[in-house]
Amino acid sequence: MIARGAEQKLELLKQAGGGLSASDVSRLLHISRQAVDKRRREGKLLAVPRGSDYAYPACQFDDDRSVAGLSEMLAARKVNHPWATLAFLVTPEDELGCSPLQALQQHDPKLKDHAIRLARAAAGGDGFG
């Protein structure tokens, strides 16, 4: 039986469109695997631990690039917990009328700025352990 926390993480990754491997992201973005890893370490791409590797939530990509404004939002979070960050990105916020990630995907500068302000405010505490 899978522990409750593991079930929640699987559901969260499913909600995020599934997880891509570093090789998948490398092909998608037309960059090397080393460049993918560097972007992850720099906080420009979100990756969640999956066994001894990482899964890159598919929702953070638009065609062959990362969602515009994503790296800015990840920097605003200042939380070194990828599962909490993923939950924040895909969970609808009443103030936005959508999830923070959906706000970025709408390419509306005011909505993007509001979502980034929420990311900064939410960085104070997350419920994942």
Q: What does each model-identified segment do?
A:
Residues 1-129:
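Non-transmembrane "mature" sequence context
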